[in-house]
Structure formats: C-alpha cells, structure tokens
Amino acid sequence: MAPQNLGTFCLLLLYLIGTVIAGRDFYKILGVPRSASIKDIKKAYRKLALQLHPDRNPDDPRAQEKFQDLGAAYEVLSDSEKRKQYDTYGEEGLKDGHQSSHGDIFSHFFGDFGFMFGGTPRQQDRNIPRGSDIIVDLEVTLEEVYAGNFVEVVRNKPVARQAPGKRKCNCRQEMRTTQLGPGRFQMTQEVVCDECPNVKLVNEERTLEVEIEPGVRDGMEYPFIGEGEPHVDGEPGDLRFRIKVVKHSIFERRGDDLYTNVTISLVESLVGFDMDITHLDGHKVHISRDKITRPGAKLWKKGEGLPNFDNNNIKGSLIITFDVDFPKEQLSEEAREGIKQLLKQGSVQKVYNGLQGY
C-alpha cells in the first residue's frame, strides 16, 4: 500500500474508532445546542416524543430505535451529573450506563397511555369500566405564563397489583327461567359474576412533568391519561391539571394584554420623565415622556404583553395607567403665587356627567 494511501486509511480508522468511543450525539438527537437549558431539553423531548413514538410510525422499521435514542438522550442530558460526565467523556464515560425504561420517561410527560396519535385522547369502550377522573388545580405564576415552564408534580398513585387468591369480578344481572310444571315458568333475576385473579392497590410514587406553555389561559386543562383513580375490573381514569394563574403584584392580565399602574410626581407629570419597568422575564421596558401627563392617562406599549397561546409570535400590549402623586404639604402663599404666574391658567370649573361622556 502506498504511504499516502496508508496515511489516509489510518486517519479514517482513527475517525471510526473515535466515533465508536464517543457514542451517540445526544444533543443532535434532541436538536438542541450544548448550551441548552433543562427547560429547552424538556421541551425538545416532549415535542419529539410525540413525533417519533413507534405507535405513530408503524411503517418505519427504525421507529423503536429512534425512540430509544431519544429516551437515552433525555435521560442523560436532563440529569446534571450524567450530563457533566457525557460532556467530558462521551457516552462511554457514563459510569452506570442509562438503562431507564423509555416508556417510563414518556409517561412522565403524557401519562400511562399517552395520546391516541390521531390527535384525540383514547377512545372509551363503554363496556370497560374505568376509575374516576381526578381534576387538580395547578397554580402557575404570570412569569410562567409569559415564558413557559415545566412543573414537576410528585403523585402517590394507587396502582392495582396481582395478589394471591381469586375474587368475583364482572358481576352483572341475568334473567334465569325455571320450569315449574307443564306450561308454567318462573323468571328470576340473579347476580352472576366471573372469577378473576385477586388484586390489591399499592401506592406508587410518580413524577409527572407538566408543561406550562407560553400564553396558557386560566382554566385550561392538561390531561395525563391513565393517571386517575384505578378500577380493579377495568382501566384507570385520567388526571387533569387545571391551570389557575395566581394574581401578580405588578401586572394584571386581560386576554393577551397586560395592565399596570405607574405613580409619578406632580413635577414629572408637568415636565416629563424617563423610567424603566422591569418585565416578567427581567427585560426593561423604557418609558419616556416629554409632555404633560395627566392623572389617569394611558400609554400603550405594543408587543409587550403576553404571547398568544395559539401563536407565540404574536404578543399583546402593555397598557400603563399613570397616577400623579400630589404634594402632601400645604403650599405657602408665595409658592401659590409663583405657580399661578408660571402656569398662567385661569379658573376652569365645569360640572358635567362624566360617566355618560358629556
């Protein structure tokens, strides 16, 4: 082999060996940069898990492999210690490996049964009994509504497990006919039951990841299928988290708009002012006024409201109402005369029905 070809072969061999040692590129699998936050990683997993789930891709022979790669990537990058080891040494550097069930990871985001991939929750068979649904109010802050977030909820869930012995199940009413004599029959209603393996309810701790989407509205529900009350003869019900947006000390929400009040001094109301308002994510909204600002005056800052739930690229407005803080001390006679001379404004005393707009 020529020296040049030998060198090329050696470089190719070293590259292949390095690739094998490094293992899978978990950042590429999730489609996030190496600087991604834990929220970015969770958001990417949740989106891709729905797209790559094997039940949604029955014609893809690699669907199961892709889904497993996605679960492995999330398991490592969502754990700070595993992520640190992976960033330093690659996949082979992980001490204890990553052997969690990727179905378990999926259920943390969607529940035991996930979604029917036609876009609707699971279809109910009316002949199969199911446990009660559970609705839980989940309080979220206005900051979370603005930027989105993932909330971890730890739930002690009763789960049906097999136990020794047998039990009666699927009990139902049936009509029985008994012949009493020639041409005489008696019909009675009896309870008939099947015999099933015995079960017992065991509490198991589950961690659920609830995604608070930007612009989420008060009262919206996030379902976790199969996470409700169990039924020993059928399916468990669903767990639904109902969003409850808590009141904010500075901003009030009305649709996609935000409202707030700003108090300025009498001097500022007359000569103008500059100030910044700290928004929900920490960025500054600058306000500059070089003209008279009357009490009750409003200022609209377009695009500084909340993101629209259906289209996060659209944002509402921030509406600012100004209050004027008048001096607390009484003015001296000299100060009064000075103000009169400065403003040169005569008496304006008008009585009218302000509520009707006259």
Swiss-Prot record:
Residues with Phosphothreonine modification: T188
Signal sequence residues: 1-22
Main location: endoplasmic reticulum
SMART domains: DnaJ
Location in or out of the cell: Endoplasmic reticulum lumen
J domain location: 25-90
GO CC terms in record: endoplasmic reticulum; endoplasmic reticulum lumen
Pfam families: DnaJ (PF00226), DnaJ_C (PF01556)
Glycosylated residue positions: N261
Post-translational modification: Contains high-mannose Endo H-sensitive carbohydrates.
PROSITE patterns assigned to the protein according to its UniProt record, in alphabetical order: DNAJ_1, DNAJ_2
Keywords (A to Z) from UniProt: Chaperone, Disulfide bond, Endoplasmic reticulum, Glycoprotein, Phosphoprotein, Signal
Domain of life: Eukaryota
Biological process annotations from GO: protein folding; protein maturation
Any one Gene Ontology molecular-function term assigned to this protein's record: misfolded protein binding
Subunit and partners: Part of a large chaperone multiprotein complex comprising DNAJB11, HSP90B1, HSPA5, HYOU, PDIA2, PDIA4, PDIA6, PPIB, SDF2L1, UGGT1 and very small amounts of ERP29, but not, or at very low levels, CALR nor CANX. Binds to denatured substrates in an ATP-independent manner. Interacts via the J domain with HSPA5 in an ATP-dependent manner.
Official protein name in the record: DnaJ homolog subfamily B member 11
